[in-house]
Amino acid sequence: MKKYIVLALCLMLAITVVMHNRPPQEAATPTPEVPSGEPPVVMPDPPEVNEPLPVVENANELGRVPILMYHRIVAEEGEWARSIENFRNDLKNLYERGYTLVNLSDFYDGKAQVPPGRSPVVLTFDDSTRGQFNYLLDAAGEKYIDPDCAVGILLDAYARWPELGLAGTFFLNGNPFGQSEYWQEKLKHMVDLGFELGSHTFSHPFFNRITDEEIRADIVKLQLQVWQAVPGYHIRALALPYGIAPRDRTVAVSGSHDGVSFNHSYLMEVGAEPAFAPDHVRHNPLSMPRIAATDELLSRWLDWLDGPLRRYISDGNPDVLTYPDELQEQIKKTP
Ligand SMILES: [Zn+2]
């Protein structure tokens, strides 16, 4: 543990040095004209904020991370369907248990901020159905986000509980989210709101029943569709349709078809347990487990995660890896 504290101090020092040496940012607003004869107005520098991070006694950045799997969000709970009411309650429950929403790739790339003492949770949505993101029209014919769709519910929860954060990874198929007149606008809107777009392939095939070339073609078709709405968007993650991987898993990771290449970093399974932390020796980005969001599985796994040394708890500092001594052997060895 000590060497990490030393490392932390070095890093903080290095960051401070870097920040001080950073060239001044381009001014966002033009410099106001100063009438001749009058001395220019000099704005004082803002006071340096150097608040130390709070020490999180139980920080555990080798702990497990729940990646929840949602499908349809609709009025009635059912198979592959979470009710609107239950989805709202899930967000409240996650907030109260100390979780903060993160996008899958942001978190696993080490780019997501999780406040000190809180735990990351990834919400994933498969099949890009209308209940996940729906527009309604007001009396004047203006579009607005349906407050009962997943995106609307996430926005509302974030407004209530800012520490819950606003994130979610949506695994898209062809013709996403119904309302064919708005699909491009919706994808762009989601990216603007900070959500992540993932691939679930264009036509949702069984990967074990088609050729490798057909797999690549289907993946590229979905990617080209996303690019129509959000040019050049890098899709980082693919959720395996039906949870079935190609015989050679790497076929779904990277490749090209018709001169268009794709490059995924993460493959998502269907089921069945909390995922390993990014720095855990057992983290396998090409086979990431997810927990189906049902009453039974959610309460079972969230209760399990509250057990000793189980769940990921952030130290609040993305530059330092903090974990209990007992887990020393579980750290991923970097070559
Ligand atoms: Zn699916």
Please name every model-derived segment:
Residues 124, 171, 198:
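Generic enzyme active-site microenvironment
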